[in-house]
Amino acid sequence: MKGLEGDMRMSQRNKIQRLLRKGALVTCLSLSVVCSSLSAVTAYAGPADDPAAAAPVIGPGGPGTTTDNAAAGTDTNANAGQQADNSYYNQTLSNPVVNPVDKYSYSQMVNDISALASRYPGTVTVKSIGKSADGRDIYDVIVGNPNASKKILFQGAIHAREYIVVPLMMQQLEYLAAGFTNNGTYMTQPLSNILGQVAFHFVPMLNPDGVTISQMGENGIQSEELRQTMQAAYAADKASSRTTVSYEEYMRRWKANARGVDLNYNFAANWEGINVSLTHPSANGYKGTNPLSEPESQAIANLIQGTGFNAVINYHAMGNVIYWDTQNNQKAAESKALANAVHALNGYSVLGSKGVGGLKDWLQQAAGIPGITIEVGRSTCPVSFSEYPAIWNQNKAVPATLGYYVATH
């Protein structure tokens, strides 16, 4: 059995390598050149001693459909989640900062971000990119060299009830930081090499108010005005038969921000045609008064426009699928290449989609940045925490895999 397992790992490793070599609209280096080019780069040793640069910036913080309305896919990789070689991702961290639990909350995330910045000074840097409607900071956590020539963004929890992606992304970034510190490898290469070439940005919880609503109900919201908005949204949806569930269940299924706007319908990508009949705030589906009407969508748009990302990865739930396309996609080939690389790693189905108003759609149409949406889990949102071990195993090495892609294109 051990020999067979080794053969399976080698087969998957070869599959990933072939996809990473394919490239998108440019000619990719062969794997031997990729590895030698990465090896030739001086391993990232962190910035010069600068207390200000190392200090975390932590402020006070006080049932599901797939994102693009496509059918859930089927895992096609029987070895999904099994890593290709004796990499750092096959090891278990000792004394980890991040300990995933059901309903992993905003306050837990903030505490863990602060602890990671303290444990890995110079490797993990933190900044707030804005505040939510209810006053919570929205954090961008950078792993690696912030001034690297290549940059990749991982964004999660734009939809409130999909909060299972938050501990996933927090563990992903911790593994990158720990791998650098402990001389970890992936695909036979030191993680420090890629961390010198690529800055990994993580926004694990873009919609902290919404996540708090889905986990705690309206009592988690500080603003009385926002609580009244939520109550009015329920009354309007109840009157129009958009919902028949109790108020408590309505809160649990909440997808929007605290102002009742679906943030993934709040971007200028065929926005005018979205849900024209829904004109009031709601737990889901309301696009807002205009694109980027919300502080959370403004925060992520400003980060993207001001940083120059080479790729953006959006984590959602549910379906075990990867979406890569949109209308008028300016980065179709590159986006499809990213999707194929993730599929080779975890076996999620690769699907095209023609979504409107979403962050991925805006990235590909207007911003000219390759992007994909990865939908994790199979149960109705909020996805059962019993699925988390499988989700982690399938996605733990996604950042390293896509980091290699970005580094070589």
Walk through the language-model features, giving the residues of each.
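Loop/turn elements at helix/coil->beta-strand transitions in domains of secreted/extracellular proteins
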Residues: 121-125, 134-138, 148-151, 196-201, ...
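Bacterial Sec-dependent N-terminal signal peptides
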Residues: 1-26
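Short glycine- and acidic-rich boundary segments immediately preceding or forming the N-terminal edge
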Residues: 40, 54-134
